[in-house]
Amino acid sequence: MEALRTEERAVRDWWGRLGLPGLVDIHTHFLPPPVMAKVRAQFDAAGPLIGRPWPLHYRDTDDVLVETLRSFGVARFTALAYAHKPGMADWLNQWAAEFADRVPEALVCGTFFPEESAAAYVAARLDTIEVFKIHVQVGNFSPLDLLLDETWGLVAEAGTPVVIHAGSGPVPAAYTGPGPVGELLSRHPRLRLVIAHLGAPEYAEFLALAESHERVHLDTTMAFTDFFSEMGGVFPAELSPRLRDLGLGGKVLLGSDFPNIPYPYLHQLESLRRLELGDDWLRAVAHDNARALLGPPKTM
């Protein structure tokens, strides 16, 4: 408990020194308890889509984890869920809506999966969902699947951000990589995508997509951390000037993967600071860019 209190003070000091009112984290996970239990079991077993031991640093009930984020001063965060089989997505969307109802700081999140009903259940919730999440690796589907074409069109028209895990880390899968995402954007150029993990390990290619598409953003989830670097996700130093420009241009957002991380939350923040891209960049990434993308918070 004392270690957590020390971390709370350090996290608040991190953003307080920047003159920020708190943090906005675009990439956190809250799931129905049976689903979260299965996710944790995969991490504990270092499952095939993980590729290495992954000792979870935070493991508790939703109520405790929400209070942890509040104690850190995370003013807004997501409850990202993702479907890995048909018939699952809308159930997750209902659960996420109920979670956001009882947690004022939580953005209303949703997901979808290539299935005949996708466009209908997305359309039914499009007025309320604030962020979607798609996991190409875990879902093992192509974002170009024709069953999703109408859904992508609806989401593009609405302008709702979609956090998409499409990079080939930590373990590549059949449909990961920048190619399918580039083709998706050629079909739906108005899509507002947030590339999870900066697209690791295909950093250069995904940075290029953000540079060439007005509505494509990147999140920092696990990037630059010691753990990620040990997995082969070292961010190339020569890309730092481009990363700086994208961050100052509103395109890079703080993400953490909390609570499913194998190190303290503070380490993600310290990893950003040691890039030495400047306080203006840190302010933009940790708060201002997400605030601009998401709009004002709901009344609490």
Regions found by a protein language model. Name each.
Residues T28-F30, A81, G110-P114, I134-V136, ...:
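A cross-domain feature marking catalytic cores of carbohydrate-active enzymes
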Residues L20-G22, G73-F77, R102-V108, D127-E130, ...:
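Short, well-ordered coil/turn segments that N-cap beta-strands
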